[in-house]
Amino acid sequence: MLRLISAASTLALTVVAGAAQAQDFRTLARQDLQAAHDQLRDNHPAAVIPGAAGDRFRSWLDAGLAEAQGKAGQVQSGDTHAYLMRYYANGFRDGNIAIRPTYEGLGPFFAIAWPGFTTRWSGNQYEVAYVRQGLRGAPPIGSVLVSCNGVSAEDLARSKLDLWEGDLNTESGRVRTAPYLLWNRNNTFATGMPQFCTFRQGRREREYELKIQPIDAAQIEAAYRGAVYTPGATPLAIETINGRPWINVHSLADNADWAGFFGQVESQVQTLRGPQGFVIDLRGAEGSSMNATARGYGLANRIWTPEFTAPRQPEAGTITYRATPANRQWFVDTLARMQADPRFVQESASVIEQTAAIVAAFDAALAAGQQTFAMPGRPLAEDTGAANPVQGPVVVLVDGGCTGGCLDVLDMLTRLPNVRLAGSTTGVDSIFIEPTVVRLPSNYADLSYGHKAWTTRQRGDNQPYQPAQGLAYTGNPADETAVRTWVGTLFQ
């Protein structure tokens, strides 16, 4: 694996495992952009699915490639290569399409210049959320950014953050990228740190000169965490807060300690089901893993029962597949891995049978020259009349970090009795689901995209969950004490 080290100026590549000492990143960028475009054009279902989601994909596929290729001459390092790849992928406005570095990239806690404070997105505006201790001449916390160097805060955000750092057409994209608005993150395609910015405090506006402050990794991390809720080192745990269980599920990743966590849940299930109620905290539960939905369903089945939750899962409807040899091969390879695992064969014979049926459907569609074919999804389970074992109220706490499989879990949790959704607006995902990953020619990036279309999904394309009135948290999401105190009031 290669680690590319950033610096303030154009710099060379640190080479690991015998790679060449210098690379023409401009050529690599053009090559990777074209390869990503061709892979999506030839295999992504959105290319041939009618409707708004397909139209959005097709409008960017070629136009976005041309736009990104026009910027490739500015690529001069691994960092700028990664930024341009992200720009093209984010332009599809589909959270299930991504181009990520295969090496350790910049990460969220990185800047080469910053003014000693940072902003957060709140109430449709950018406001100061964190100021370095002892910093003089900075706008006070809560000040609203009006403009910088004569450019409005919105126009600055669009030029500097949108597509480069995230999707500003979504609330979650606004929240997660807001700390970077006044930082220089070594993106040569966008402006760096502005010199003069105007902030509003109440009705009064004042211009401040932003001065570069020393870069300290701990300060940069604290500044980001002071503006955006960021899960800690232990994503899975059960605590007791205000006299009731608080179930932390801040990750749905495969490498989290699910065995230990599920053991905790099972040992405390009688308490969880008691009249006092409990909290399921899904903030930051990024769910890009193929198993993310199953992990969340596994938690629900342990707290309630499979007999109670299964009839309340959303109806799957039909799934549309694009009939291409590459997409068929993905299922062939998946089926082979399933059949080679004795435990999976023993425990999941129905999944193997279903996957084999999909491969057969690919063969039939390809032989007939069809572009697509549809398969029925999981049938809705019959309601056996099983009683609800959970006596008390349940609050499910979410934020913009709840994405992908986390949203699938909400599709089911929000259908259970006495469950309320609280917090802030979640992330979004498209109807193009189940990621496939392709290594791009440079070896420095992977393209991932959803390779089948859930055209009948009850939750619409790119539709987030938004807590109802009275259940939306409007304070600083990074103030954990305030968040927990507020959640406690929801049980009163």
Annotate each PLM feature.
Residues 292-376, 384:
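A substrate-binding/cap region within the structured catalytic cores of diverse enzymes
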Residues 382-397:
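Short, conserved helix/loop micro-motifs enriched in His/Cys and acidic residues
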Residues 309, 339-354, 450-473:
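Extended, charge-rich low-complexity interaction segments
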Residues 1-8:
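Bacterial N-terminal signal peptides that target proteins for export
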Residues 22-321, 325-333, 393, 408, ...:
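Flexible, low-complexity junctional segments that flank or bridge functional domains
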Residues 17-19:
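N-terminal signal peptide c-region/cleavage motif recognized by signal peptidases
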Residues 393-415, 420-429:
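Extended C-terminal subregions enriched in glycine
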Residues 2, 272, 416:
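Acidic-histidine catalytic/liganding microenvironments
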